[in-house]
């Protein structure tokens, strides 16, 4: 699933390509992709003749502010497992997994391509609170790049939780936008084993973890995100972070720090990658080796 860096990469690309451009029409090829409104015709009518004022990101959600002479509405997108937003000329052949097409001037269009069909798109009418339609937004924790994401904030989210830190980091009510890839990477950078219980973490470890989360996300955004399966940016280009990942998807390969084989285990049904030499239950003493 695309995580914060991949969604941020898409947001930046959309702002470069679609800003101030008017949506001239739309075509929905798979009705269930449209989460709201329930009428596909109402969705197409709602977005037509609206210009893209800007694209925002909240966690893994993309939100386009749509402006018309009389009102402001919103377009929401969640890529889920395999969703892609691709900026293409209208003459480009349709991919068989194309679900929604948004038409713009100069024969350009924005296509939502989604192999697994889990992705969703919303149109929020003028005067309606975005969170009342895209209800997942109200459950999101602070964004890692927001001022709210302090050591104290993260500590308050983790304290008294008797579950593994890796599992907690995947909870969008703990950290918005983090997923399997960057949870593994941040835990390696902070020297903490994924099975460590949240309740056992010291404040110093949480401080290191917060810093590591921000660092790995920034590094991945600079690399254009990670492509292990389906992710592409709006121009159809792969992300490059996978080539420099510390542990994710590297089971059996030598650790980039100590040379020991990277291990993989299952936690709450998800794969977790780590180095048993560089990561410990306490974690703090190993941190300096990755700076």
UniProtKB/Swiss-Prot annotation:
Catalytic residues (UniProt): 2-3, 60, 270
FPG-type zinc finger span: 246-280
Keyword annotations of the record: DNA damage, DNA repair, DNA-binding, Glycosidase, Hydrolase, Lyase, Metal-binding, Multifunctional enzyme, Zinc, Zinc-finger
GO biological process assignments: base-excision repair
Recorded superkingdom: Bacteria
Entry-linked Pfam families: Fapy_DNA_glyco, H2TH, zf-FPG_IleRS
Keyword Metal-binding recorded: yes
Cofactor binding notes: Binds 1 zinc ion per subunit.
Subunit structure: Monomer.
Protein name listed in UniProt: Formamidopyrimidine-DNA glycosylase
Organism: Nostoc punctiforme (strain ATCC 29133 / PCC 73102)
Gene: mutM
